[in-house]
């Protein structure tokens, strides 16, 4: 198990987790050991995603970098977007989905690292996306004030819902029976069977991250030191606790045998791991913490395994019928605009390989490809500076 975190300082941190409990009275305590620090990008990191083999990072430098966690080498880089990478999501070990400020959503083959589909998803920026547990649907939100549903089996848009405001987070529940849409400090809870808002929760500050701890309990972090657990059925706050000395930037939740853990990262530089109690009204207990001394932006946990998932996308050769989930989520709600999108831009069929050798990466080839990329970036910066001087 390994914690990975990105920061404004362009660095990716890796910390090995040792869950063996230490003797500390009745309090269980884990240990964190620094494994690596890697100068990953030429701008601040904005997103991270993990599967059983790779960690991928997105940045304001418009690139996605891939790291082989088993070999502990940089595997290469994906260059397709022309804006800050805002979100990265793996589905199983086979596919990666990326969203960016250029309005594109890209579906990548996580074996060959080819761009299988490039979709103009939003008229503005793509701010967040979430994949349904079935792998057949995805939701995305953007700066065009829409919530969009994607048929991942066919690789096309299914429905567009006008939500009248710019949302910055959308998240499915573990069973996919409901989802939340975050607008500033407001949480709208949608039920899949009715496609309507069943309730609204208001947080004190702007929300930066949410994670479902169960089908009905939602952890909420924002521009403050406190984390709150809300019941999505009763809409009440079950508990709140001070997690950090500064605003919480990201959270990650996972389960291992006899343990349910939530990990938090903050602008104060700390990454902390907390043990969740069965009764979510009881605040979690601190397992371990580490100070990176950096301004953290994003967080992931590499578990060396992923849950069993049925690979339902990328686009199939033949169109599939609209699923029950799509029919439900596409229901019209009074006061909202919901319609099925007819036109779709042509898919980008051009294959885009990793930077460097397309063969199986070795430690040497991975390093060479990284050096070449950095040299090109330096030359490009010098050319731009010369052009500015000539213009002056």
For each predicted feature, which ranges?
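Structural hallmark of WD40 beta-propellers
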Residues: 1-4, 52-56, 65, 74-76, ...
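Short coil/turn segments within WD40 beta-propeller repeats
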Residues: 9-13, 43-46, 61-65, 73, ...
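Eukaryotic tandem repeat interaction scaffolds
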Residues: 153, 157-243
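Short C-terminal beta-strands that terminate individual repeats in beta-propeller domains
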Residues: 25-28, 35-40, 74-80, 115-121, ...
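Loop/turn segments within WD40 beta-propeller blades
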Residues: 47-53, 71, 82, 88-94, ...
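Terminal intrinsically disordered, low-complexity extensions flanking WD-repeat/beta-propeller proteins
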Residues: 1, 11, 20-23, 44, ...
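Beta-propeller domains
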Residues: 8-31, 60-62, 66-70
């Amino acid at each position: 198990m390994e914690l990975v975190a990105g920061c404004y300082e362009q660095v990716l941190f890796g910390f090995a987790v040792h869950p063996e409990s230490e003797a500390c009275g009745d309090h269980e305590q884990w240990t964190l050991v620094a494994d690596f620090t890697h100068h990953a990008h030429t701008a601040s990191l904005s997103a991270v995603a993990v599967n059983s083999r790779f960690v991928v990072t997105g940045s304001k430098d418009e690139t996605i970098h891939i790291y082989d966690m088993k070999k502990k080498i940089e595997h290469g880089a994906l260059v397709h977007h022309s804006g800050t990478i805002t979100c990265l999501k793996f589905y199983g070990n086979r596919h990666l989905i990326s969203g960016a400020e250029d309005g594109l959503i890209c579906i990548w083959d996580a074996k060959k690292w080819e761009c299988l589909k490039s979709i103009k998803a939003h008229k503005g920026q793509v701010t967040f996306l979430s994949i349904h547990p079935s792998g057949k649907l995805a939701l995305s939100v953007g700066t065009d004030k829409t919530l969009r549903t994607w048929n991942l089996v066919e690789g096309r848009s299914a429905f567009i819902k006008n939500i009248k405001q710019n949302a910055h987070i959308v998240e499915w529940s573990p069973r996919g029976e409901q989802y939340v849409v975050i607008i500033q400090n407001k949480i709208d809870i949608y039920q899949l069977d009715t496609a309507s808002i069943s309730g609204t929760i208001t947080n004190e500050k702007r929300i930066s991250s949410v994670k479902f701890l169960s089908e009905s309990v939602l952890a909420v972090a924002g521009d403050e030191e406190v984390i709150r657990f809300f019941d999505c059925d009763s809409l009440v706050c079950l508990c709140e606790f001070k997690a950090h000395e500064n605003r919480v930037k990201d959270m990650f939740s996972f389960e291992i045998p006899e343990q349910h853990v939530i990990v938090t990262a903050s602008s104060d530089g700390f990454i902390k791991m907390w043990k969740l109690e069965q009764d979510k009204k009881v605040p979690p207990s601190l397992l371990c913490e580490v100070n990176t001394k950096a301004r953290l932006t994003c967080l992931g946990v590499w578990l060396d395994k992923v849950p069993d998932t049925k690979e339902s996308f990328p686009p199939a050769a033949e169109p599939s019928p609209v699923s029950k989930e799509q029919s439900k989520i596409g229901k019209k709600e009074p006061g909202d605009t919901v319609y099925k999108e007819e036109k779709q831009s042509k898919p980008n069929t051009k294959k885009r390989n990793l930077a460097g050798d397309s063969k199986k990466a070795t430690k040497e080839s991975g390093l060479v490809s990284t050096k070449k990329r950095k040299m090109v970036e330096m030359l490009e910066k010098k050319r731009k500076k010369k052009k500015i001087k000539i213009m002056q």
